[in-house]
Structure formats: C-alpha cells, structure tokens
Regions:
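Sec-exported extracytoplasmic/periplasmic mature domains
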Residues: 54, 82-86, 101, 163-167, ...
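Secondary-structure end/capping motifs
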Residues: 33-34, 237-301
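Periplasmic-binding protein-like
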Residues: 114-129, 206-235, 246-249, 283-288
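Cleavable N-terminal signal peptides
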Residues: 7-8, 18
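N-terminal signal peptide c-region/cleavage motif recognized by signal peptidases
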Residues: 13-17
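Bacterial N-terminal signal peptides that target proteins for export
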Residues: 1-6
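Short, glycine-/small- and polar/acidic-enriched structural segments
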Residues: 21-168, 174-177, 193, 222
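Short, hydrophobic alpha-helical packing/hinge segments within bilobed ligand-binding/sensory domains
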Residues: 76-78, 86, 95, 183-186, ...
Length: 301
C-alpha cells in the first residue's frame, strides 16, 4: 500500500512538472534583411508572438522562454539551428536549401513553413561597384574580385550571372566571401571591384552614395524569396507554437501592408537601414511582392 502511495505521488509530481514546464522558443532573425521583417523583427518589436501563444489545454500551466538572435545572413543561422540552439529561422531560398541539406546530413529535418517576401523575376538581389569605378556592366568584371555573402541568395544569383557570361566561376572571376557589413567599407576603400548582395544592400549602398548598381537580380530572370523554417522535431512536439508564430507573421504582414511608412520608420530605428530604402520594399509598389503566399515560380529558386 505504501509503495502504491509513493508511486502515485511520484507520478503526480512528474505530471505537475511536465504541465508546468518552461518551453523555449528560439528564433533566428535577419533584421537588416528587411524583407524578413514579418518573420522576425516586427514580431519581436510589437510583441506579436506573445499575443498568440497558447495558454490552455496542454499549455495551461506552461511558461515560455522566448529567445531572439539576429544574424546578417542565413549560413550562420543554419549552423545554430542544426546545433539545436534555434527552433525557427528566417532566410532566403539558397541558404534555405543549404539548411535542408545540413539538417539531413545531421540526421534531422527542417520544414519550410511560410514565404515572407519575394520576386518571381529575381528583384532584390544585385551587384554594385564603387561609385568612382569605371565599370558599367557585368561583362567588364572578368578577372576582377567580386565579394558576396557565402551561401546567400545573392551568391546563387552571382553564380547564375557568371554562368550566363560563359565564365568559369573558379577561373574567370575572383569570388570571395564577405558579409554586407564588411563589404560597405571595402567598397568605400576600393578594396574590391564589385559586391553582390541581397535585400536591401544592392539598393542601400547606392542610396548612400558610395556604390552604383550595375546588375539587377531581375536580369537573371530567376526567382528569389525569403521565408521561415522550423526544426521538424520541434514542430511535431509543439505544433500549436508553430501556429502561433504563423499567426504573428500574418498580423505583421497585414500591419506592413496597412501602414508601410510607419513600419518602415520602425525598421529604420531598429536596423539603421534608411526608411526610404525600407519603403522601396514594403510600400504598395515595392521592389518585391511582400506576402506570405507560395508561388509556383519559387520552385525554380
């Protein structure tokens, strides 16, 4: 009898502990990649995730540890997702493909759950040169040094553009890895001949006067998009939290659509990216289509 009572107390203690658990929600964002705003920055700054998190049923006694970590590109974000340090992540098509491969290599899986923004033609990516450069077109960059964030959507665009010129990317151009925050200084110092990048840098650098765009991603006529991914094991364990994240993302997108000027200013305050450049992407005639719907053309990305 005593053993039965003790067993019952242990079981009750375990059940109480399980129902009162603290659930981690770790989200990797790319704040300066402003077309990811509806999947990260705005959700965080406006407290939208907390608005939709479940507090009934299995989550009645749960508490949440919401963690945010910002990155400047998708590759390092993927590394932390695979290592189990992040549950959600926002990134573009090319790094998203690497994300899937990296998860499978580790014996796990990630799930693509939502588009955040994109262009079926490839707008948003681009190649810029220093403003004082005499280079006027991509064809003049043969034998030159072009930097690009490694494994980014801009990297994919650059490889397509080089192939379209009939060049060997290992012999005819010197492609080096360089994140946007370093590339800006390198362009101003004349340390590189050109830089390929994703949203918003192909517009931001020329806007600030130290670079000039010579190639727009739309010239590659290959779609590009940014979206959100989640660790599959996490999604299976906490599907209601994935739904909460998606609902928060939908509201963030609706707010952007309703008041693009207001939220372009907020994004500028958080990231330092000029509000006018933010509006180029989030305004009603934006460079990209900012919505959460999947388009068949995105499969080509």
């Amino acid at each position: 009898m005593l053993r039965a009572v003790i067993a019952g107390l242990v079981l009750a203690s375990f059940t109480l502990s399980a129902s009162a658990e603290t659930i981690r929600i770790a989200i990797g964002t790319q704040d300066t990649t402003i077309n990811c705003a509806a999947g990260g920055l705005l959700i965080r700054e406006l407290g939208l995730l907390e608005k939709y998190l479940p507090h009934d049923g299995a989550y009645k006694n749960a508490s949440y540890d919401v963690q945010w970590k910002n990155f400047t590109s998708g590759a390092p974000l993927t590394n932390e997702m695979v290592a189990g340090k992040l549950d959600f992540g926002a990134m573009a098509d090319f790094p998203g493909a690497f994300n899937g491969v990296a998860f499978e290599t580790a014996g796990k899986h990630s799930l693509f759950i939502s588009v955040l923004s994109g262009s079926i033609k490839g707008s948003g990516n681009g190649i810029v040169v220093p403003s004082a450069s005499g280079v006027q077109s991509l064809s003049e960059l043969k034998g030159k040094t072009i930097s690009v964030p490694f494994a980014s959507t801009a990297h994919g665009m650059l490889l397509r553009a080089v192939a379209a010129q009939g060049w060997d990317p290992l012999k005819d151009v010197n492609i080096i890895a360089q994140p946007p925050e370093v590339a800006g200084s390198a362009l101003q110092a004349g340390k590189i001949d050109a830089h390929a990048d994703f949203v918003p840098f192909a517009e931001l650098f020329p806007s600030r006067g130290f670079a000039r765009k010579i190639y727009d991603g739309a010239q590659a006529n290959a779609p590009t998009f940014h979206g959100a991914l989640v660790d599959q094991a996490y999604a299976k364990k906490h599907p209601e939290i994935v739904v909460a994240y998606l609902r928060a993302s939908i509201e963030a997108n609706q707010l952007l659509a309703a008041e693009p000027e207001k939220y372009s200013e907020l994004i500028a305050k958080v990231t330092g990216v000029d509000a006018e450049v933010n509006y180029l992407f989030h305004g009603p005639l934006g460079v990209q289509t900012r919505d959460l719907s999947w388009k068949p053309e995105y499969r080509q990305a």
